[in-house]
């Protein structure tokens, strides 16, 4: 859910009940034209837009006594180099924003740390997608606030769903190889 509290609760339940071997969280960043492998989550919620619960958080720590940041433990660099090498639209990003995506990324690591679990975990921002197989230069119905990791614009780039799905599947494959 696009909710600070809801995402923390859902993550806590899933990580406790399922006990996965790896965690790969995804979020849409409208306006990006590449799949972004996020490298760092910071202990900060700060966006002047509401989440789905109507909550606005500005300059608030996610966990007041928590770490300042967590780094992805997914094989980000190796996946990026390999996928970029075959011409896929990927990038390494050093900011997951300060909205719910960053919150999810941070909370996943914090919860895993509290559970004493050291497993691969990270976050990937995907651009808006369209169902056909040709990239679109613009979609005028999509906008996103900069705090959410996107851009505010009347037209934003999109990628074909199949391309995004392939990139995410490849990152999962690379993660499973290093486990």
Please name every model-derived segment.
Residues 1-98, 109-118, 143, 147-179:
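N-terminal catalytic or cofactor-binding beta/alpha core of small enzyme domains
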Residues 97-101, 126-128:
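Small/polar glycine-rich anion-binding or flexible loop at a beta-alpha turn
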Residues 101, 105-107:
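Active-site glycine-rich loop that binds ribose-phosphate moieties when present
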Residues 121-136, 145-146:
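An accessory alpha-helical subdomain
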Residues 139-141:
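Short intrinsically disordered coil segments
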């Amino acid at each position: 859910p696009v909710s600070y509290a809801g995402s923390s609760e859902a993550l806590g339940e899933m990580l406790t009940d399922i006990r996965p071997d790896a965690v790969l969280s995804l979020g849409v960043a409208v306006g990006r034209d590449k799949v972004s492998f996020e490298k760092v989550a910071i202990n900060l919620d700060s966006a002047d837009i509401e989440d789905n619960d109507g909550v606005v958080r500005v300059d608030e720590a996610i966990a007041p006594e928590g770490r300042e940041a967590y780094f992805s433990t997914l094989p980000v660099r190796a996946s990026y180099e390999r996928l970029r090498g075959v011409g896929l639209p990927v990038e390494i990003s050093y900011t997951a924003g300060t909205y719910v995506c960053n919150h999810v990324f941070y909370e996943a690591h914090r919860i895993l740390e509290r559970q004493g679990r050291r497993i691969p975990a990270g976050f990937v921002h995907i651009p808006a997608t369209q169902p056909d197989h040709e990239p679109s230069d613009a979609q005028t119905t999509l906008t996103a606030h900069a705090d959410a990791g996107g851009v505010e614009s009347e037209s934003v780039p999109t990628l074909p769903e199949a391309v995004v799905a392939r990139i995410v599947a490849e990152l999962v494959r690379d993660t499973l190889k290093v486990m």
